[in-house]
């Protein structure tokens, strides 16, 4: 396989953590991982309020349990997805098959775009529910900073995941170009589908096998001097 296919060198090389952490997509994964922790951590720790007059806790976002559940679910799943693809980034240089690398990069594009969309939905949902929340439900303003942090980092996550999708698409384009020769090129002399054998440049000298040597004129074929006119006797 050609070196550099889909953004990584030839398979079998030694693992280089310094090169890994310098990759833009790896940096964005780590940032997205941190953002997801902030989102679900803020909601789990301070997203539910207690009212002395009520026995059960309620969600800080307009008392809508779906808002808190959505933020926690998306945050946890995005956290796990980041870990999965960070592990894939570590293993990716060891993948020797160009087709397998292509599948990994395509999955990166799809998953990253998927999470960018879900973070966009989550940001809109949480921001809307926060705007319509009633002050009387939280007179002491408990957990307001955490609620705003979850909204803000949901917004930031849109761009980190979209950036991962863009970088993965760039890797796909570069990888497709670099793998083109190794996948499609075939030596004509080894191609059995060709109707005729390839032309072989004749070499100087004798050809004992009689296969493609230089043409040899028969000895004395054209060496005889032309004879003069011979009169016929009558």
From Swiss-Prot:
Positions where N-acetylmethionine occurs in the chain: 1
Region called Disordered, residue ranges: 201-234
Location(s) in or outside the cell: Cytoplasmic vesicle, Secretory vesicle, Synaptic vesicle membrane; Melanosome
Lumenal side: 45-71, 125-148
PROSITE patterns: MARVEL
Entry similarity comment: Belongs to the synaptogyrin family.
Name the record gives this protein: Synaptogyrin-1
Native species: Mus musculus (Mouse)
Gene behind this protein: Syngr1
């Amino acid at each position: 396989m050609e070196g550099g296919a889909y953004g990584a060198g030839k398979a079998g090389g030694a693992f280089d953590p310094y090169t890994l952490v310098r990759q833009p997509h790896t940096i964005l994964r780590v940032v997205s991982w941190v953002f997801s922790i902030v989102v679900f951590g803020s909601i789990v720790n301070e997203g539910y309020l207690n009212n002395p007059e009520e026995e059960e806790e309620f969600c800080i976002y307009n008392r809508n349990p779906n808002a808190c559940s959505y933020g926690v679910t998306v945050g946890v799943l995005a956290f796990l997805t980041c870990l999965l693809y960070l592990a894939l980034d570590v293993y990716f240089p060891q993948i020797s098959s160009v087709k397998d690398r292509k599948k990994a990069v395509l999955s990166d594009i799809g998953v990253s775009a998927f999470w960018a969309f879900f973070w966009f939905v989550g940001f809109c949902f949480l921001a809307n529910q926060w705007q319509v929340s009633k002050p009387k439900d939280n007179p002491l303003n408990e957990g307001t900073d955490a609620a705003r942090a979850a909204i803000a980092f949901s917004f930031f996550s849109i761009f980190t995941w979209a950036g991962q999708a863009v970088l993965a698409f760039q890797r796909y384009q570069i990888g497709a170009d670099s793998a083109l020769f190794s996948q499609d090129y075939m030596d004509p002399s080894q191609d059995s589908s060709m109707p005729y054998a390839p032309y072989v440049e004749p070499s100087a000298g004798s050809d004992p096998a009689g296969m493609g040597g230089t043409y040899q004129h028969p000895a004395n074929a054209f060496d005889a001097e032309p004879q003069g006119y011979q009169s016929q006797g009558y």
